[in-house]
UniProtKB/Swiss-Prot annotation:
Any GO BP annotation: S-adenosylmethionine biosynthetic process
Region (Flexible loop): 100-110
The name this protein goes by in its record: S-adenosylmethionine synthase
Reactions listed under catalytic activity: L-methionine + ATP + H2O = S-adenosyl-L-methionine + phosphate + diphosphate
Pathway linked to the protein: Amino-acid biosynthesis; S-adenosyl-L-methionine biosynthesis; S-adenosyl-L-methionine from L-methionine: step 1/1
PANTHER family per record: S-ADENOSYLMETHIONINE SYNTHETASE
Subcellular location: Cytoplasm
Co-factor: note: Binds 2 divalent ions per subunit.
InterPro entries: ADOMET_SYNTHASE_CS, S-AdoMet_synt_C, S-AdoMet_synt_central, S-AdoMet_synt_N, S-AdoMet_synthetase, S-AdoMet_synthetase_sfam
GO cellular component: cytoplasm
Annotated positions binding Mg(2+): D18
Gene name of the encoded protein: metK
Length: 418
């Protein structure tokens, strides 16, 4: 990396078509797990003008009305006007669900360790729901130990959605943000560009000229969104920061009418904004036996505790799994030259102190019980604005309860480096 460089991350609002799908998928998951924590769920959603398709594979004892759940979530997001081409009460909802494949189920229900190696350990009972590789990341750029660009991008979209609901009534649900941060010697030092694209009414009060409409939106967003977002942050926009709003000149047609949406298409928004690697697996609509989701949460948990313990300024963790096998195939820890101890020793301590089998992840985080314990909604709340670094939610994988344990276990190595 050069000494001075720019890094960009994006976020999208809850009304973005892909995020509509993610939230519907996780609303279905919440409803099923609330009634039957053993539910196996892979709920996929497609949205387009006037249409929602719910498909995938589900095995459950729960009894839910899928159509009602879909319409309720769309209403909550804000699509209630059929004149905009997509509305909760007028869209068609098609349901095409199958049961989980028995070939997959047999490997999840009884892991290889139990079937072939005759392990009697309870946590060896559940096999990974698929093969795959997952990454987790943490760094000390923000209090929540997230990269600054994605943290800011999420702040902008969350604030944009909030002012749509409470202050700027001419805004519509679809929207995106993008924040470009200036780095020097690996540390953020400035804000180069802030981009906001937001769906809006064609006119604002008596303002009908398109250019005047955009000027009004830009002024309002600067005052109601950008300034509050940066109010408590040391690094702020300055006279050299570019502020771009709806660069096409207009954003009236949006949401599922403007673009089809699909579950699982915003995996970089869901994670670290491109700052860390990604294994490719999406989260939403998947029950916790799917390691795409649960192991990615575990990777974040490990990485965050390492950084919180002061053992590294940056940490990336990779896990990989084989379908039907409980124990990870591989574990990798990378600290990018910022680690205070040898990575091999760090890996050893992580393996000794973190449970990384699927049943262990489910048990550690309570992943199958959380929807029922939290009033029927948990996963749908992380389906927009990121699964990590959420200071507004109580997420078990964001805990730093292992930091002191790691420091204690590695204290001899830390003393040796002093």
């Amino acid at each position: 990396m050069p000494k001075r460089y720019l890094f960009t991350s994006e976020s999208v609002t809850e009304g973005h078509p892909d995020k509509v799908c993610d939230q519907i998928s996780d609303t279905i998951l919440d409803a099923l797990l609330s009634q039957d924590p053993a539910s196996r769920v892979a709920a996929e959603v497609v949205v387009n003008t006037g249409l929602v398709l719910l498909t995938g594979e589900i095995t459950t004892k729960a009894q839910v009305n899928f159509v009602d759940l879909v319409r309720q979530k769309i209403t909550e997001i804000g699509y209630t006007d059929s004149d905009n081409g997509f509305a909760a009460n007028s869209c068609s909802v098609l349901v095409a669900l199958d049961e989980q494949s028995p070939d997959i189920a047999q490997g999840v229900d009884s892991a290889q360790e139990t079937r072939e190696e005759k392990s009697d350990q309870e946590l060896d009972a559940i096999g990974a729901g698929d093969q795959g590789l997952m990454f987790g990341f943490a760094c000390n750029e923000t209090p929540e130990l997230m990269p600054l660009p994605i943290s800011l991008a999420h702040r902008v979209t969350r604030r944009l959605a909030a002012v749509r609901k409470t202050q700027l009534g001419y805004l519509r649900p679809d929207g995106k943000s993008q924040v470009t941060v200036t780095y020097e010697d690996g540390r953020p030092v400035g804000i180069d560009t802030i981009l906001v694209s937001t769906q809006h009414d064609a006119t604002i009060g008596d303002i009908t000229d398109p250019a005047a409409v955009q000027a009004k939106i830009k002024e309002d967003l600067w005052n109601a969104v950008v300034l509050p977002v940066f109010a408590d942050i040391d690094i702020k926009p300055d006279d050299n920061t570019r502020f771009l709003v709806n660069p096409t000149g207009q954003f009236v047609v949006g949401g599922p009418q403007g673009d089809a949406g699909l579950t699982g298409r915003k995996i970089i928004v869901d994670t670290y904004g491109g700052y860390s690697r990604h294994g490719g697996g999406a989260f939403s609509g998947k029950d916790p036996t799917k390691v795409d989701r649960s192991a990615a949460y575990a990777c974040r948990y490990v990485a965050k505790n390492i950084v919180a313990a002061g053992l590294a300024e940056k940490c990336e963790v990779q896990l990989s799994y084989a379908i039907g096998v409980a124990r990870p195939v591989s574990i990798l820890i990378e600290t990018f030259g910022t680690g205070k101890v040898d990575e091999d020793r760090l890996l050893q301590v992580v393996q000794e102190n973190f449970e990384l089998r699927p049943a262990g992840l489910i048990q550690t985080f309570g992943l199958t019980k959380l929807p029922g314990e939290r009033g029927g909604r948990f996963y749908q709340d992380v389906a927009a604005y990121g699964h990590f670094g959420r200071t507004d939610l109580d997420l078990p994988w964001e805990a730093t309860d292992k930091a002191d344990l790691l420091k204690q276990a590695l204290s001899p190595a830390l003393s040796g480096n002093a």
